[in-house]
Amino acid sequence: MYLSPQEKDKLLIYLAAQLARDRRQRGLKLNYPEAVAYLSAAVLEGAREGKTVAQLMSEGLTWLTREDVMPGIPEMIPEIQVEATFPDGTKLVTLHHPIR
């Protein structure tokens, strides 16, 4: 099976996000790469489900809280930008201060 570089990136994000979901479910606080992967994968999945950019930007502010991550992580992530494929094309989704 051949995967393009973009498909490989999405697969790695999914894998890292799954690890982050598992750790969060066990009550562990997420570190920087886990939090970024968790949020990025949620954007990609939301786009795949047909949500709009505006919906994802709004919902993205509720996916993780300060209690879900290690101390200092919210300040390390002032924004996340994810290029996601929507039914009408590829768009850039930006989450500003996604961990509150």
Curated annotation (Swiss-Prot):
Family, as annotated: Belongs to the urease gamma subunit family.
GO biological process: urea catabolic process
InterPro entries per UniProt: Urease_gamma (IPR012010), Urease_gamma/gamma-beta_su (IPR002026), Urease_gamma_sf (IPR036463), Urease_subunit (IPR050069)
Organism: Synechococcus sp. (strain JA-2-3B'a(2-13))
Keyword annotations: Cytoplasm, Hydrolase
Stored SUPFAM superfamilies: Urease, gamma-subunit (SSF54111)
Protein name from the UniProt record: Urease subunit gamma
Subunit structure, as described in the record: Heterotrimer of UreA (gamma), UreB (beta) and UreC (alpha) subunits. Three heterotrimers associate to form the active enzyme.
CDD domains per UniProt: Urease_gamma (cd00390)
Pathway recorded for this protein: Nitrogen metabolism; urea degradation; CO(2) and NH(3) from urea (urease route): step 1/1
Presence of the UniProt keyword Cell inner membrane in the record: no
Locations listed in the record: Cytoplasm
Annotated catalysed reactions: urea + 2 H2O + H(+) = hydrogencarbonate + 2 NH4(+)
GO cellular component: cytoplasm
Keyword Cell membrane: no
EC top class, as a word: hydrolase
Enzyme Commission number(s) from the entry: 3.5.1.5
MF (Gene Ontology): nickel cation binding; urease activity
